[in-house]
């Protein structure tokens, strides 16, 4: 082979960008291959970063030395803390971005990174020999050799787009598909499956009746994702840096649903044209109308794609219905009666590789030096993809440098839970991360991501000494203040739900002056300490005992109080004989297993045999 690199990264979406940057920053000669340079790191669907559990992943990624958090901070236009009325463990940051500016910023980082070469090209085949990857062959016949190859192909493998009866090859509107790589993977012995995703129409901002809608302003107190943004702020650089935008809330109507039901026969989803399973937590509108037939309305959030962008993203209206049907149902929604569509919604089917074919490092079991990350592993979401890309990139680089892998435990990071669930349980639908998937979720909070993971980022060379020292200083400040509160008896008062750390210090001249993030972490540490310890003991007991708890044949899972419809569906389909078997069902959360175990111990919440057939 003529060209030679240490690492080749195939695909430069969110997973590929993080993987390529990690390898290059760790000193390896890295080639990033993409179908179009100008489409690298694009926010393909919603123009936002973060969200429930996703915000946790972004902060963890940043603590390890990743790029997504900083890139989002630079172009944020609408900041929101989700679950703000709930406990700190489930509170999550979501940042609406200037879509175009995000891609421009990430591309500037990629294209200027030392040790990283970005080149356009389609990988037609992998080259392997003796159980080890050797490189790739491009569509034009060019051969490139490498010691490691990372596949981060997103939704592009054998991708097919659907709008009503129309089909077009491509992984994203305006982009082609990766046509030959699936066959190459199969030839090497890999199993592939088929998933689908979708996106809503993009609306003309000027054609929306904003006065008829309910405004949804962002939070006035905003916290950046990245430690680097904080440092830059201390140096005088303002934050936020983009003008803010106000989103708006509307909803579908019975008329909307009637239009959808009358046209289901034109939906590729219900015609049988789409065989891939779609994401449970981001269903198409037509799917929602069928699955939740009794609901008369579904919320729709209208999100401008930038301060000056003419486009609006209607969250909640993903669809693959024909263009004429899309326009008709849009006009039945308040505020959208005269809306103009700039680009219609569509669905994408694509190949994925079941992730049980991977090691914990995301290296494939069959071919040494070959790594999979992102939607190729059956996940959905920018943040899940980015974290996997960083994880795979770090571990590929460490392997080539002869160093031990980076494998934080499930009690250290939501990202570790994500990877562990993927490689041990696999997926039967596009995987989305939730805090409930972690048995240690009380200690895995957004606010302490740096305290948990910064040492790992520094160890692998992605987090500079300055950043680690800042984190260590913050950690010491938290530890010392918690110890002082315990020593003086004030911790007992702070544990009361109605008492805050600020209230404890009122009128006390000797009260220490702490930064807001330190004071907040002190309060959370004190209030959560008992619960965290209790949860850890419960998790240990549960892990030891679950295989001993048998589930009666014909057990009515839908009678178990608190179980989600997803959990009931999975339990009913798999019919586990023990709680231990239930724990190993793909996608079943530790929270659901705990609820099931409690019900079985009580023996009163569900009859052993269902009185009526389950749906």
From Swiss-Prot:
Q: Which InterPro entries match?
A: FAD/NAD-bd_sf (IPR036188), GIDA_C_N (IPR049312), MnmG (IPR004416), MnmG-rel (IPR002218), MnmG-rel_CS (IPR020595), MnmG_C (IPR026904), MnmG_C_subdom (IPR047001), MnmG_C_subdom_sf (IPR044920)
- The answer, when asked if Flavoprotein is one of the entry's keywords, is yes
Q: What Pfam families does UniProt report for this protein, alphabetically? A: GIDA, GIDA_C_1st, SAM_GIDA_C
Q: Which positions are annotated as binding NAD(+)?
A: 278-292
Q: Which Gene3D superfamilies match?
A: FAD/NAD(P)-binding domain (3.50.50.60), GidA associated domain, C-terminal subdomain (1.10.150.570), tRNA uridine 5-carboxymethylaminomethyl modification enzyme MnmG/GidA (1.10.10.1800)
Binding-site positions, FAD: 11-16
Q: Which UniProt keywords apply?
A: Cytoplasm, FAD, Flavoprotein, NAD, tRNA processing
Quaternary structure and partners: Homodimer. Heterotetramer of two MnmE and two MnmG subunits.
Name listed for the protein in its UniProt record: tRNA uridine 5-carboxymethylaminomethyl modification enzyme MnmG
Q: Which organism is it from?
A: Myxococcus xanthus (strain DK1622)
**Taxonomic lineage per UniProt?**
Bacteria, Pseudomonadati, Myxococcota, Myxococcia, Myxococcales
